[in-house]
């Protein structure tokens, strides 16, 4: 049986609105960007994928067009192999990745071709009448995928009025109103979690740390556990703490936290993987990462040092097939798979659903930023998060339909932006003049 031929490939850069979310790298800008890949085959099907935004990634995708168009959808692995063989490493890519959360290097960790892989799997699934998850690993493992409520500290957008952050104070949706307002205290974080529980049914929560002093962030963690005694509560400071501080903060909370994500990073001449291994020896908590094991080579060293228990293998880092390969290996070794997330539209949400449905064993609840973008749909039929679970689209392929009018609107917004690359330092200047990123200092501690 022959499979359809890819007859066209289009790359559409898009933008959406964001809140003033705080992380170690600074404050999210009013807008985020993504790149959308659209493939069409000679059977009349459309396949789509979504990936990291910015000009670098957009150009990398467009450079692949000649390697994709004219190829049979069924040979998608060969297409990807051809892309890999023709891709040259950027001169600016020093291989460090995001081990210190230098956001300028994220574009080198996210591989553009994985959006093409998603679109090809979408087409192949439609050709075969199978869901995308049936084409990955050992096939579909579940009908819905558990997700967590991703909590963020949010700064006051009124301090950066000229940046024109979106205001949703007139929205009829309680969460939409809340997500644009300042939330920097334990009480505010608990209110955020309660609102998300009511809207999406989340039982499990992760707080993005690296913003305030570690002791202050742990007060919020304890308040969350008190509000949700049966919930799984986690925190991710993105390696902001020293080894000693991480041990001091986490050891008393071994019965409060479910896992700790990237508690510490490189110090005193030792790598992140070595320092995290020492942390694991000192504290009885599972350790997760999306910083020190973002590819197979990094994972090899992480596994050899027993630095982590949970790998948040984002398919935008690992690829869709690669994310499931690592999920299988982790499951065989008695370790745990999950997925990291960045700001994204609902195409990525559908992709998370498909990958999560194919992951074997008992994955940890997946990250998703979708709650911060919910309502900015590019699809006619975005998957829903109900009772804390992401529904897996039932139609063949990715299982969703792109709305071309909404895509065009998002592209117009992108074209109005003065810059297309992520820059978390820009908005920080309105909060702390002359602020500069420091991987060892929470962003509001200067």
What are these regions (language model features)?
Residues 145-190, 209-210, 237-242, 288, ...:
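Active-site mouth loops of central-metabolism enzymes
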Residues 192-205:
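Catalytic domains of carbohydrate-active enzymes, especially glycoside hydrolases
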Residues 6, 44, 116, 129, ...:
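Conserved, mostly hydrophobic/aromatic
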Residues 4-7, 12-16, 305, 326-329, ...:
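Flexible C-terminal active-site loop/helix
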Residues 107, 118-166:
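Glycine-rich, aromatic-flanked loop segments that form ligand/cofactor-binding clefts
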Residues 1-35:
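Short, Gly/Pro- and small/polar-rich lid/capping loops
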Residues 40-127, 435, 439-446:
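Metal- or metallocofactor-binding catalytic centers and their adjacent structured scaffolds
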Residues 207-348:
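Catalytic core of soluble alpha/beta enzymes
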